[in-house]
Amino acid sequence: RAPVRRHEAQAMPPVRWTFPMATQLSHLDALESESIHIIREVAAEFERPVMLFSGGKDSAVMLRLAEKAFWPARVPFPVMHVDTGHNFDEVLDYRDRRVAELGVQLVVASVQASIDAGRVVEEKGPRASRNRLQTVTLLDAITEHAFDAVFGGGRRDEEKARAKERVYSFRDDFGQWDPKNQRPELWNLYNGRHRKGEHIRVFPLSNWTELDIWQYVADDDVELPSIYYAHRREVFERDGMLLAVSPYITLMEGEEPEERLVRFRTVGDASCTGAVESGATTVEDVIAEVAASRVTERGATRADDRISEAGMEDRKREGYF
């Protein structure tokens, strides 16, 4: 074959290469992909991971992501609930039903058992709460079961202490967190190195917001406890919050219960979790409500975060979630 002369080569039409268009992920797809990568990374890297599951919206979404990460196989690690004994019945019913559906092992770490064993002392008085006592119960359960990685549903938009915490949060032999001694996380590279007795807290939802959670609930049809939607309940006002009338709370002088239409933005110990007045009965209603809100759910409804300006960070340093 005769060689192509230079002037002939210049006259040849340019070759047009066509490549298929890259699929553009929605922001929810991108968040889901990141979280599933983190969950799979932990399952591959650690010997005994566990996922905290309280039945709240964040842990419900996190468990759905774990389900997707390993489908069609089962979730390969247990879930754990640190049970204060002061729970909302609707949340416990949901927790048990969801665990049964997935066929995963449920580890219940009981604060009451810690009290009975003398590990912690229960607070007294009308403002008493078991919220802070959970730290000892959690750390004891981690030690008892030799868990080396603990998934949590914390998000950075919730509270300023969580905003500066890494996805992989190193905890020392005592379960303590030192915010000044955190490991760098470049792109999707995570350092899970630890010694025996130490463990890593892992937060796959770090980059999600409350609105992202609710949009994902709508998009993926995630079931949640009924108290996340508007319902009539007896409540009373304390320190600007609406607390549910409960056998775990002693009313103070001047506090009068009344029935109101409310819902809960976050779920925790009944003694310190407030409700908000709301008529949002559907996921779409809640999304519209959250989109218009300018206060995070913890800032608006959690009495335990109002103890001091550094209330959450102080608890996390001790080993809290």
Model-derived segments and their meaning:
Residues P13-F321:
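Nucleotide-activated chemistry modules centered on ATP-dependent adenylation/adenylyltransferase
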